[in-house]
């Protein structure tokens, strides 16, 4: 008969300083299906090392070990995990149940890694617990169970995937005599059902219940009686549970890892919250700076647009401050007409200005009088609280009419409800008030100078007696490039004048400069916020490293029941990502509260959250979890099952 487990000249040595200590010395052993074998020996004899090699938790230094004819030396880590999952069931002296899982959930764990669907897992776990007399303890946690009950849960877990070979390491060592007898009775029942049962013990009474007792001393087998053929043995076991397809196994494993991650977070609420705090602050900082910074930028740009955007101002001279008399009369009315005919011009308004005295009854104030066209107010985004602007007839007839700003109206007519139609003196010229213009409130503040506007024809002909213009403001049509329009305007006037005796000021260039400046500032602040997010990520990595250390035994248990390294990696990586995602969601909520609070104190600001900003925030959370969770998850996946199980 072919042995189920076959060991030939197995040796296992461990480094001890500069030397190698040999624990197993040429072990040769055959174990047949359906046997109940006891391996006995004193502490340090090598029996636990032999059990680890039998259960594929450890590899021999040399020699050959075959399971059902398969040489385990040819298998990689994932194949060994599959072998443990499908052929072996472990029963440990200290039970090794996961404390945060119920009895039922502990029994389900091996089937999770086999890819069995949840409904089937649940039914099989309940069936096994019922068979072992624990049907009324399925929802109990390990701390709520007695030692004997915990060991029965451990046995049920060993049988979850079939348990063709049951490896029991001191199964009664931590139990009282009555519970120990119950456990041994269960092992006998399993033997009768066709399971191969291997008991590692130093208790002679337990060993005596086995059909064959193998004694090991100082790493060598000193007693190995031949296997006894059983007349009624069937040589089989209950069928192994059917594993699901690769896709279902992946989905089941992912869902279980997600569930386990959530349970781990819930089990340490305060630590989880403190871990999330760095992510919450980081995400809230990034989102708030992006959103509030964008609102501030739009506010600044709106103020600049209120001054007049997409406009080009033309002034006489070489540059600001140039008062050379030869350039003062450079701009003429003919230039204005020529500019208005250009296809890229939406409107062109001249400006003639002079500081004059305004008088009404006994009120006498200084003001800046500006001669403009009717388009001037549209160009600069001004509205009228009373009356209206000049019409073409008033421009052509040099009408003695005037538009006041709100400050001038308040100074001249503090108690009048309606000032349209009133007559004031502008310099020495009487003028009828036809409107009151309201300038947009700007975060840059308002000028202290009182301002009035007259038709440019009136200002130049009746007030100043000059035939030239102080400036021309050109509004470029939508769709035309402002910089190109500025170049064409410069060429036009240079050809007309025969020289360049003027200069231009493009407000669109100012707008672009401000946009660039605000973007740079916003980027700088975002980078500062990202630093806080990185600090939060480092905090997550630190806590996850601590978590891996604390849960080393749990990792060993999972590997013993069939978890692959990739399963462990996935679980801890998902846990890190989940911490960051929940922290990210709370961070976004905090940034919303910050934004709404700011809006209460800054009603003029339009603070809005774009879906892209929220998506980027969640993306940042996910990337942070992956980046800073990778190292702890990798460390967990690289743990040796034997070392992990030995940790306290």
UniProtKB/Swiss-Prot annotation:
The keyword rRNA-binding does not apply. Its EC number is 7.6.2.-. It is a multi-pass membrane protein. GO terms for biological process: response to antibiotic. PROSITE patterns: ABC_TRANSPORTER_1 (PS00211), ABC_TRANSPORTER_2 (PS50893), MACB (PS51267). Keywords: Antibiotic resistance, ATP-binding, Cell inner membrane, Cell membrane, Membrane, Nucleotide-binding, Translocase, Transmembrane, Transmembrane helix, Transport. SMART domains: AAA. The chain crosses the membrane at residues 273-293, 523-543, 576-596, 611-631. One of its GO terms (cellular component) is plasma membrane. Residues 5-243 form the ABC transporter domain. It is found in: Cell inner membrane. GO terms for molecular function: ATP binding; ATP hydrolysis activity; transmembrane transporter activity. ATP binds at residues 41-48. InterPro entries: AAA+_ATPase (IPR003593), ABC3_permease_C (IPR003838), ABC_transporter-like_ATP-bd (IPR003439), ABC_transporter-like_CS (IPR017871), MacB-like_ATP-bd (IPR017911), MacB_PCD (IPR025857), Macrolide_Exporter_MacB (IPR050250), P-loop_NTPase (IPR027417). NCBIfam families: PRK10535.1. Part of the tripartite efflux system MacAB-TolC. MacB is a non-canonical ABC transporter that contains transmembrane domains (TMD), which form a pore in the inner membrane, and an ATP-binding domain (NBD), which is responsible for energy generation. Confers resistance against macrolides. Homodimer. Part of the tripartite efflux system MacAB-TolC, which is composed of an inner membrane transporter, MacB, a periplasmic membrane fusion protein, MacA, and an outer membrane component, TolC. The complex forms a large protein conduit and can translocate molecules across both the inner and outer membranes. Interacts with MacA. Belongs to the ABC transporter superfamily. Macrolide exporter (TC 3.A.1.122) family. This is Macrolide export ATP-binding/permease protein MacB 1. It comes from Escherichia coli O1:K1 / APEC.
